[in-house]
Swiss-Prot record:
One Gene Ontology term, aspect cellular component: cytosolic large ribosomal subunit
Subunit structure: Part of the 50S ribosomal subunit. Forms a cluster with proteins L14 and L19.
Pfam families: Ribosomal_L3
Keyword RNA-binding: yes
Entries under InterPro entries matching the protein: Ribosomal_uL3 (IPR000597), Ribosomal_uL3_bac/org-type (IPR019927), Ribosomal_uL3_CS (IPR019926), Transl_B-barrel_sf (IPR009000)
Protein name listed in UniProt: Large ribosomal subunit protein uL3
Stored PROSITE patterns: RIBOSOMAL_L3 (PS00474)
Keywords, sorted A to Z: Ribonucleoprotein, Ribosomal protein, RNA-binding, rRNA-binding
Gene this chain is encoded by: rplC
Coiled coil: none
Biological processes, Gene Ontology terms: translation
Known function: One of the primary rRNA binding proteins, it binds directly near the 3'-end of the 23S rRNA, where it nucleates assembly of the 50S subunit.
Keyword rRNA-binding tagged: yes
Residue ranges, annotated region (Disordered): 134-166
Organism: Gloeobacter violaceus (strain ATCC 29082 / PCC 7421)
Length: 215
């Protein structure tokens, strides 16, 4: 895995390329992200770089969290902490700033976010189940149907697709194209939609697998 950056989803808009085609993009405020911890094989058993994003008042954080930020030499505590696994983390030091200069236009990236919560949803909306007959005599219109056999096994298997809370899950969208990078404003424009609400936290990293871009 390569080092990425943390950002905040601002919303969607569209821009026009040189040929006049409209490109839908998501605007992300990315970084600057201070390095809060560098993990190594000797001390942690694996190599990774932990980044921080956003600011928070000390009163809303625990004392260990405040001490963790002060140990990294940060002027103010950060609200979010995320780490990126790397094969070699020796080139990074606590307090170092990671900015959107990490990316370039045309690059493919993977974006991780938390999907929008939809609340309690039924089988058709949550799992795309088919409906039952809509005839006058039918009583099975949107019901999920059988959820298992009888005495054997005598239980519902774990993971059975059923109605329940929908959304609010970690979602990864792969191989999206960076359309534009604006370093002076800490903004990156990524083609297409990204998971989560406006203001939601995103993790942006170089694409693990390269090939034809989505969109």
């Amino acid at each position: 895995m390569s080092l990425g950056i943390l950002g905040r989803k601002l919303g969607m808009t569209q821009i026009f390329d040189e040929e006049g085609r409209a490109i839908p993009v998501t605007v992300v405020e990315a970084g600057p992200c201070p390095v809060t911890q560098v993990k190594s094989e000797a001390t942690d058993g694996y190599t990774a770089v932990q980044l921080g994003f956003g600011t928070a008042r000390e009163k809303v954080l625990t004392r260990p969290e405040v001490g963790h930020c002060k140990k990294a030499g940060l002027e103010a505590p950060v609200r979010h902490l995320r780490e990126f696994r790397l094969p070699d983390s020796s080139q990074y030091t606590p307090g170092q700033q990671i900015t959107v200069d990490l990316f370039a236009a045309g690059q493919l990236v993977d974006v991780v976010g938390t999907s929008i919560g939809k609340g309690f949803a039924g089988g058709q909306k949550r799992h795309h189940f088919g409906r039952g007959p809509m005839a006058h005599g039918s009583k099975n219109h949107r019901a999920p149907g059988s959820i298992g056999a009888g005495t054997t096994p005598g239980r519902v298997f774990p993971g059975k697709r059923m109605p329940g809370r929908m959304g609010n899950e970690r979602v990864t969208v792969r191989k999206l194209t960076v359309v534009r990078v604006i370093p002076e404003r800490n903004v990156i424009l990524i083609q297409g939609g990204l998971p989560g609400v406006e203001g939601g936290l995103l993790m942006i990293s170089p694409a693990k697998s390269v090939g034809r871009a989505k969109g």
